Amino acid sequence: MSASEAGVTEQVKKLSVKDSSNDAVKPNKKENKKSKQQSLYLDPEPTFIEERIEMFDRLQKEYNDKVASMPRVPLKIVLKDGAVKEATSWETTPMDIAKGISKSLADRLCISKVNGQLWDLDRPFEGEANEEIKLELLDFESDEGKKVFWHSSAHVLGESCECHLGAHICLGPPTDDGFFYEMAVRDSMKDISESPERTVSQADFPGLEGVAKNVIKQKQKFERLVMSKEDLLKMFHYSKYKTYLVQTKVPDGGATTVYRCGKLIDLCVGPHIPHTGRIKAFKLLKNSSCYFLGDATNDSLQRVYGISFPDKKLMDAHLKFLAEASMRDHRKIGKEQELFLFNEMSPGSCFWLPHGTRIYNTLVDLLRTEYRKRGYEEVITPNMYNSKLWETSGHWANYKENMFTFEVEKETFGLKPMNCPGHCLMFKSRERSYRELPWRVADFGVIHRNEFSGALSGLTRVRRFQQDDAHIFCTHDQIESEIENIFNFLQYIYGVFGFEFKMELSTRPEKYVGKIETWDAAESKLESALKKWGGNWEINAGDGAFYGPKIDIMISDALRRWHQCATIQLDFQLPNRFELEFKSKDQDSESYERPVMIHRAILGSVERMTAILTEHFAGKWPFWLSPRQVLVVPVGVKYQGYAEDVRNKLHDAGFYADVDLTGNTLQKKVRNGQMLKYNFIFIVGEQEMNEKSVNIRNRDVMEQQGKNATVSVEEVLKQLRNLKDEKRGDNVLA
């Protein structure tokens, strides 16, 4: 043994001690914690991080020097309650105003609005001397406050992805229920074009959340800076994604903003919360893959979703909500109840199994029954049309990428993504008179839309679906009354399901077609109809379709989630494009007018509505809609014949009934029926066979299981018929 080896051996002996020894080496907790923190960050960190910071600091100093030279003038800040506060331009901020009101208010704020524009709380006011500036202060309870809070949380995630994974981040917006960030992650980020893609998985979440925790603890300020296109291209030279966005979104000679928090500097219009310390609870939820800008011809990216709150109690409540939503997931229930399935041989196209088809047909029958009462005529139209039709309608120029197209005999055809052009052809097929209007035409035709495979999700995002689609051709004078009729229709259908709903009137957007006078008149009619209706509605300014104003209807489910299903749209352009006309009431027999076209759907997509209803009812279908209404269970082999007789009577009366003739125990049969959510289980034995009766177990009255009195078959048929016809949701026989 060499001298050096002997020395090493001796050192090892000194370190070898028994567990019971008081001299045992104790772990250094501080060192371990430091080591753990260091392992969260790449070493060395990506070079672009320091390059960005150096450039940002230099440009920010130039900007601050410029602001320092700006003249200070007095401003009048008008709060929402009418109170007026004094301020100084380029010095006073919305946060200063909030602190002057109360510290508790300032501490809970997310963002402000200055003259209707979202504005960073720490950004000074700008304006002319003595100018009145309207100020709104928004906290997390407001929709806009939530969006800003989650947008800022996305930046925290972006910083984590850069520092922990070396990712090239792309887009990181807020969503209706949280936020996400898209990114490219490779095995080697030095040559992103050559390195293989690295998948982000939930195994990466602890590390990402660890960095996020540090970012939040450091209370990193969100700093805004306006940069020229030239400087932006220099700052983001390392990222082909950011470079593309700058080149395509920022005009030559133009400028836009970036925001910094800690080591992250990102292309962003903002605004943001004051600092990351406002985030008290942060959690990553799921991951998926996507394409850059949603285009399948672009690079495949990784997407990580998260949620955050300004209060840990809100996070606890949200996670509880997610657990409940998971139990109600229509994909889970659809599999358990054998309602539908999907197969890779036809992505995004639902295979409706027998029990799911029962639900589907019941929904369609509900609409058909109402159509007869409300003066609608049902039609059937082709599934594919020559591209010339789509050129006439305008869809070829604006919607072609969302269509499935193909060649037939050297002509280009497309599967229809909507029914309206076909209905226009029907209207134009012969001369029409004012006496025929309003003409209400309904269509359950199959529609195809070319959704990206990564966006497909159960019944809520599909490629093939059917709508309860209808179009009303009417005169301008009939618009208001037709809208009122649709409101009544909505109220009835949603009342059957037990949905609460609200409406939004979306008015003329910046880019529109047609005359302003026509728009104003149409919006006035819609607003008048909404006021007469008297329900919950608000104006969504500037969000109308380019061809006409619209009303969007949102329904609230059992989990208080809002879904947009129904829509009412006024269309002045398709009648023009198809040159639709009707003989007017004018005495001049050669006088013709253009009809107005109202696009209308109540369920929307039948597929999506089925998903919403599945989760709303948690698979416990109301009797009239249930695919499994009654299960007949004999207590023994001797009573199987009678059980089959009862089942046949139920079937002949139009009910969905089954009989369990398996060799399982009575308890097992009942349990199986309960798992499949049969509304009623009829137990039959000696007494029931002799009395021609059944013993009823109600799915929704668990405390009475096994204690129910027997009811004659004739009486129960009558009670079931009433329950079905009344479309009640209480599942109670009377």
Swiss-Prot record:
Cellular localisation: Cytoplasm
**A cellular-component GO term for this protein:** mitochondrion
Classification via InterPro entries: aa-tRNA-synt_IIb, aa-tRNA-synth_II, aa-tRNA-synth_II/BPL/LPL, Anticodon-bd, Anticodon-bd_dom_sf, Beta-grasp_dom_sf, TGS, TGS-like
Q: Which GO terms describe its molecular function?
A: ATP binding; sequence-specific mRNA binding; threonine-tRNA ligase activity
Phosphoserine modifications at? S195, S289, S453, S457, S605
Per UniProt, the ranges with Basic and acidic residues bias are 11-30
PTM sites of type Phosphothreonine: T297, T381, T460
Keyword Protein biosynthesis on this protein? yes
Region annotation (Disordered) ranges: 1-41
Concerning Pfam families, the annotation shows: HGTP_anticodon, TGS, tRNA-synt_2b, tRNA_SAD
Q: What is its EC number?
A: 6.1.1.3
- Per UniProt, residues of the TGS domain are 69-135
Q: Top-level EC class, please?
A: ligase
Q: Which UniProt keywords apply?
A: Aminoacyl-tRNA synthetase, ATP-binding, Cytoplasm, Ligase, Nucleotide-binding, Phosphoprotein, Protein biosynthesis
Q: Name one GO biological process term.
A: threonyl-tRNA aminoacylation
Sorted alphabetically, which PROSITE patterns does this protein's record hold?
AA_TRNA_LIGASE_II, TGS
General remark: Present with 42600 molecules/cell in log phase SD medium.
List the PANTHER family.
Answer: THREONINE--TRNA LIGASE, THREONINE-TRNA LIGASE
What's the family? Belongs to the class-II aminoacyl-tRNA synthetase family.
Q: What is this protein called?
A: Threonine--tRNA ligase, cytoplasmic
Q: Which organism is it from?
A: Saccharomyces cerevisiae (strain ATCC 204508 / S288c) (Baker's yeast)
